[in-house]
Each structure stands twice: as structure tokens, then as C-alpha cells.
């Protein structure tokens, strides 16, 4: 206990507490005078947590001689927890202390254990409504450490503060208090990227009580992809049956990227479909293999065509994600842990791990599923894959031009957003006037990169309505789309070069 190494002192204190040593109180009292600041703070925290009222005089003695403000602040918190008759008398004079830690210690010591203390209440209200940013930030921090829902109305005020750092701290404190009346206000701030880590922490603390509000927010039409992905992250962090049931409702969402992320997080929660529902995922799997087979054929037709290099690359990225989605679907039907391990090793550069993953699938899958899954995972050329799948998923060979036309007509609506953007870029690059309606409808796409590419392509095609569209998108919610619209507007307004 007299060691100069804090870890050794903590270890001894833990052992003494674990065995319920008869002299535990006296021994902690000795540690209160340790030379090391962090050790004194640890001792005071233990007195507070264990409510060792027989050490109240030791705490008072420490308060009277302590020079370190962090230790002094902790001493005030501890003394408040011990519930002594003179608590208000000793702590109230420090409510307006110049030092942050001392003031915080006195406030927490009083309000956490005597929430109706009038001077402390009045001072808290002054801090919450102060014109000074630092004082409001102190209030947001204090409310979390006080940890009582009786003060939630103050947190509600701070959640609407113009300073994001204060809102961030208020969200963190709300997660500690867990007043359900604050959930709506917190979830409404998901679109603010800077607040998302604090929101995730708070919602994880709320647990299942936050899921209904998160579900409503997810279904709101104004939320963009990144915000929906963040809600999925939160649901995964909360975990449990209710979170899984909520994620399962999103498996048919229109966005291919979000759908893949839903599957990924369900897999990490080790979701297993009920026997009566497995056919749903088998059907999804067959649909996915159908698209993958089409992608293989399309990439084969565009391979080596320099004009379509960007589109070919986008199809390759989409192929990788859809192949991964196929493995995630299998994990819902067969043992999840085994399938996630297999998924991790299927593309391993270590031959033994890859071979083992394929053997697991060969032993696990039914014959029907083997026929459509293994050709997409084994070491085969594209032509060999297509040959093995041609009975179930026949594909025809097309010229690059005809394949791209088919892609626009049949794949655009189900494609990942980067693939859509590359296809629109190709239309502008090729001066292709046959898909003006697609370009116009793509200006309403939820993805900024798709909207800005549609604007660029329409500009390249000199569509008659381009100026009207540019005027609209100068006020687009996305800064990148606004910038593209402004640049294109200036380009169209510039006089033609006489040379």
C-alpha cells in the first residue's frame, strides 16, 4: 500500500476489498495520505463507492490540507456521498470556486446526494443559462456526473445549444442519466456527423429503450445513406433480440449498399433464421447469384475496352460486395460462427486457409446450393464459372456497346451508387442522348456523387433544361453538388471562345 507504483497499490486494494478484509476501512484511510495524486483520488473514490462513513473525518482532514485541485474536487464528491450533517456547510462555499475541478466536486457532492439543495440548484441553473460557453460546458458535464433524471430539463436545454461541443457533452451526459424523454432529441441529431460518436455511446447506454426511436429515424425519408448506416451501427452496438428483429425489417431496403451493411451487421450479431424463414434467404441467395453471374458476363464483354475501363472497374467493386453478401446470406442459414470464419478465409493468400474454407462450404452446403455457390468461389476463370452456371443462369455474349445499353436498361436500378455514377459518366463521355430521362431522374438520387455526375453529363450533352437544373442544384444539400453546379453554371455563362 506504500508502493510508489500506483498499479501495485490498486492491486492491493482490490485484493483487500475482494476478501472483505476486516481492516479495509483503516487501510484505505492510510492510502488517503499517499504521496501520489492518482492514488489519493483512487482511495477517495473507493470511500465514496463503499460509503465508508467511518472515514468522514479522514476525508475532512484531506479537504483541509489538500493542495491538488483534482484530489480536492474528488474529496468534495466523496464527502457528499457520505451524507454527513454538515455537508452543505462544508461544500456550499465552493460552488463558485474559480477552479473547474473544485467547483465540479462541490456541485456533484451536493446535488447527487441532496438534489434539493437550493444554492446548488440555483448555481446549476446559472451555469446552464450562462452566456459563457465554458460555463455551459461545465453544466453539461456536471449533469452527467450528478446522474439524476430530476435535472433532465436542463439537459434538454443544453441539447439545443448552438455550440456543438456543449451538445456533444450533453448527449454523453444523457446517456448516463438515461431519461427516455431525451431520446427523440438525441436521435434527431444523427445527421450532425460530429455528434455521431457521442450519440452511439448514449444510445448504447439506453439500450433497447432507444430502438423504437432509432427505427422511426431510420425510416425517415430525409436521412441519407451515411446516417442510416450510423443507425445500423448503433443497433448492432445495442444488440439483443429486439435489435436483430429491427435489422431484419431492413433486409429488403432499396439501397444496395445499405442492404449489404444490414446483412453484415446481422451476421456479426450471429443472426440465425428460423427454420420456417430460411427459404427467404435461400431465395435472396439465388437472386444474388443471378446478379453476380450477370456481372461476370458484363465484365467479360467490357474487358480490355479502354473506353469502358471506369465502368468495368465499378462492376468489379460491386461484384466483390455482392459476393460477400452471398456469404453473409449463407451465414443466416448455416452456423453463423463457422460461416464468418469461412468468410474471413475464403480470399486468404494462404493457400491452406483458402482450401479449408472451401472444404467447409463443400461439407456444409446442400447439393443445390453447392452448384451455384462454389463456382463463384473456387479458383476458376470467368468462362469456366459461366459455363458451370449456364443451366441455372444463362448469359449471352454481347458487344461492349450492346452490353452497356443493357446495363443502363436492366442494371442501373439495382446497381451500387458508384456503379450508377460511372454509368452516368459514360453517358456524358459518349455524348449519348438516348437516356436523357435517366439523367434527369438521377438528379433526385440520394447519393451526391450520382447527382453531380448527372449534372456533368447533362452539361456535356448540352441538354436544353441544363440551366434550370443547375439553378436548382446550386442550393443542393450537398456541398460537392453545389460546387459542381456553380462551376457548370459559370462555364455555360462564359462567352464562347472565338478562336
Regions found by a protein language model. Give the residues of each.
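Short inter-helical turns and helix N-cap capping residues of alpha-solenoid HEAT/ARM repeat scaffolds
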Residues: 4-5, 35-37, 67-68, 98-100, ...
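Non-transmembrane accessory domains of multi-pass membrane transporters/channels
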Residues: 1-26, 311-318, 322
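Redox- and metal-dependent alpha/beta enzyme cores, enriched for Fe-S-associated oxidoreductases
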Residues: 24, 360, 368-377, 382-394
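Structural detector for internal amphipathic alpha-helices that build alpha-solenoid repeat scaffolds
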Residues: 8-20, 30, 40-52, 61, ...
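N-terminal transition regions in large eukaryotic proteins
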Residues: 3, 312-317, 324-343
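Amphipathic alpha-helical scaffolding segments comprising HEAT/armadillo-like alpha-solenoid repeats
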Residues: 1, 21-33, 52-64, 84-96, ...
Amino acid at each position: 500500500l506504500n508502493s510508489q507504483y500506483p498499479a501495485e497499490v490498486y492491486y492491493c486494494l482490490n485484493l483487500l476489498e475482494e476478501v472483505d478484509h476486516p481492516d479495509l476501512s483503516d487501510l484505505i484511510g492510510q492510502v488517503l495520505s499517499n504521496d501520489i495524486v492518482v492514488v489519493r483520488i483512487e482511495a477517495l473514490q473507493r470511500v465514496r463507492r463503499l460509503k465508508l462513513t467511518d472515514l468522514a473525518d479522514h476525508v475532512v482532514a484531506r479537504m483541509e490540507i489538500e493542495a491538488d485541485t483534482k484530489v480536492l474536487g474528488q474529496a468534495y464528491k466523496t464527502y457528499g456521498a457520505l451524507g454527513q450533517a454538515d455537508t452543505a456547510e462544508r461544500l456550499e462555499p465552493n460552488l463558485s470556486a474559480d477552479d473547474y475541478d473544485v467547483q465540479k466536486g462541490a456541485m456533484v457532492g451536493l446535488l447527487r446526494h441532496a438534489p434539493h439543495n437550493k444554492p446548488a440548484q440555483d448555481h446549476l441553473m446559472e451555469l446552464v443559462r450562462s452566456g459563457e460557453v465554458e460555463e455551459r460546458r461545465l453544466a453539461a458535464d456536471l449533469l452527467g456526473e450528478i446522474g439524476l433524471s430530476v435535472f433532465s430539463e436542463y439537459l434538454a436545454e443544453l441539447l439545443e445549444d448552438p455550440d456543438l461541443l456543449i451538445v456533444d457533452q450533453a448527449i454523453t451526459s444523457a446517456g448516463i442519466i438515461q431519461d427516455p424523454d431525451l431520446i427523440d432529441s438525441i436521435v434527431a441529431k444523427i445527421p450532425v456527423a460530429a455528434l455521431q460518436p457521442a450519440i452511439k455511446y448514449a444510445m448504447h447506454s439506453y439500450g433497447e429503450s432507444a430502438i423504437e426511436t432509432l427505427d422511426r429515424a431510420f425510416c425517415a425519408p430525409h436521412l441519407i445513406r451515411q446516417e442510416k448506416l450510423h443507425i445500423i451501427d448503433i443497433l448492432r452496438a445495442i444488440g439483443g433480440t429486439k435489435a436483430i428483429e429491427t435489422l431484419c425489417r431492413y433486409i429488403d431496403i432499396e439501397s444496395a449498399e445499405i442492404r449489404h451493411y444490414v446483412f453484415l451487421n446481422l451476421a456479426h450479431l450471429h443472426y440465425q433464421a428460423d427454420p420456417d424463414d430460411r427459404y427467404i434467404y435461400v431465395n435472396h441467395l439465388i437472386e444474388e447469384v443471378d446478379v453476380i453471374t450477370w456481372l461476370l458476363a458484363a465484365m467479360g464483354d467490357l474487358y480490355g475496352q479502354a473506353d469502358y475501363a471506369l465502368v468495368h472497374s465499378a462492376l468489379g467493386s460491386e461484384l466483390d460486395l455482392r459476393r460477400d453478401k452471398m456469404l453473409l446470406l449463407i451465414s443466416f442459414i448455416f452456423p453463423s460462427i463457422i460461416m464468418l470464419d469461412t468468410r474471413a478465409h475464403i480470399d486468404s493468400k494462404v493457400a491452406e486457409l483458402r482450401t479449408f474454407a472451401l472444404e467447409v462450404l463443400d461439407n456444409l452446403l446442400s447439393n443445390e446450393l453447392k452448384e451455384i455457390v462454389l463456382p463463384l468461389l473456387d479458383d476458376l476463370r470467368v468462362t469456366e464459372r459461366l459455363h458451370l452456371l449456364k443451366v441455372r443462369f444463362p448469359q449471352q455474349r454481347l458487344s461492349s456497346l450492346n452490353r452497356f445499353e443493357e446495363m443502363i436498361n436492366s442494371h442501373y436500378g439495382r446497381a451500387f451508387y458508384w456503379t450508377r455514377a460511372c454509368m452516368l459518366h459514360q453517358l456524358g463521355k459518349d455524348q449519348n442522348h438516348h437516356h436523357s430521362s435517366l439523367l434527369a431522374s438521377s438528379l433526385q438520387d440520394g447519393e451526391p456523387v450520382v447527382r453531380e455526375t448527372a449534372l456533368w453529363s447533362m452539361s456535356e450533352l448540352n441538354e436544353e433544361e441544363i440551366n434550370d437544373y443547375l439553378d436548382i442544384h446550386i442550393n443542393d444539400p450537398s456541398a460537392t453538388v453545389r460546387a459542381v453546379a456553380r462551376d457548370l453554371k459559370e462555364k455555360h455563362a462564359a462567352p464562347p471562345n472565338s478562336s
